[in-house]
Amino acid sequence: MKTIGFIGLGLIGGSIAKAIRKYHEDYRLLAYDQDRETLAAAVSSNMIDAVCEEHDERFRSCDYIFLCAPVEFNVKYLEYFKDNIGPDTILTDVGSVKGIIHKEVERLRMESRFIGGHPMAGSEKTGFEASSDRLIENAYYITVSYTHLRAHETEADL
C-alpha cells in the first residue's frame, strides 16, 4: 500500500487526490491545507484518510508528496521536508513555473528526491469545491527532473 501526502487541496491538489482515491482506494492519503474547512470537507467525503499539521511527522511515511500550494509556499516547504521525509520519498510540485523551485532544490541538494510537475489542466474556478477526479483525466502531466538521479527512475509511477 502506498502513502501519498498533499500540501494544498485546492483545484489541482484536490483533483489529483480525488483521482488517486477513485483509482487506488487502498492508498493512504494524508493532507495539510491552511483552510480547515477544506480539510473537513476532504475527510467527510472520505477523500483523505488523515489531516496533518503543516509540519507533521506522518509525512515521513509517504512514498510521494505533492506540493500543491502556490509556488512561493512550495519553495518554503522544501526546507522543512529536506530532513523530515523518508529516504525514498519523492516530492513533486504542480506549480506553473519551475525556475524558483528548481534553484531551491539544487541549493538544498534534493535533486534525487524531486520531480517538478505541471498538469496541463485547470478551470476558471478555484478551490477544493471545484476539484474533480475528472479534471486531470486525459490531461498531459509535464514532468521535469534531474535525469542522472533516482527521482527520474520513479516518474513512471506518478
Enumerate the language-model features and the residues they cover.
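Rossmann-like NAD(P)-binding element
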Residues: 57-82
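Glycine-rich, N-terminal phosphate-binding loop of Rossmann-like dinucleotide-binding domains
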Residues: 69, 95, 145
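Acidic/polar active-site rim loop that often engages polyanionic ligands
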Residues: 133-142
